[in-house]
Amino acid sequence: VLAGQTFSDEERITARGKDVLVIGGGDTGSDCIGTSNRQGAASVTQIEIMPKPPVGYNPATPWPQWPVVLKTSSSHEEGCVRRWSLSSTRFIGENGRVCGVEVEEVDWLPAPDGGRPQMRPTGRKEILKADLVLLAMGFLKPQLPDLPENVFVAGDAASGASLVVKCIASGHRAAQEVDRYCTTGQR
């Protein structure tokens, strides 16, 4: 049930009995893992594009920088395979349904200027079996090109990472813009 709407079994997305792949390693990814396990997923795998961070203190991120350390949530403890330094390169489908994701190992090279490390694809690829893929990827900031007037954006994609309540409000504003556009032809 969502806002008083009931979804049929055919419309409902569930992890029950599925091989779930979570792409992204943050809090949202952790929530996806926990929900998938509680719904009875056959397997849960989480991939992260960044390298595996160290446990405990990380000399690469001294105070006052945000500490980049390995975090294991209660959702991870419920069970999942965690893999690092993998980039998804394509989705594989059969009969209109996803059945796998091709991933490529990446190396991270120090930036010559001491800035953000540079990602380098290795050419080592494999297919991960998945019949449910959950995208939990972050981003640095929204980089919106000039969009056609009939394309609307809301939430994190419009304003950057924020609270869910702000994303919901953004969705409401976007819905009003869509309605105005559809009824008047004006943005």
Please annotate each region the language model reported.
Residues V1-R187:
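Residues forming the flavin
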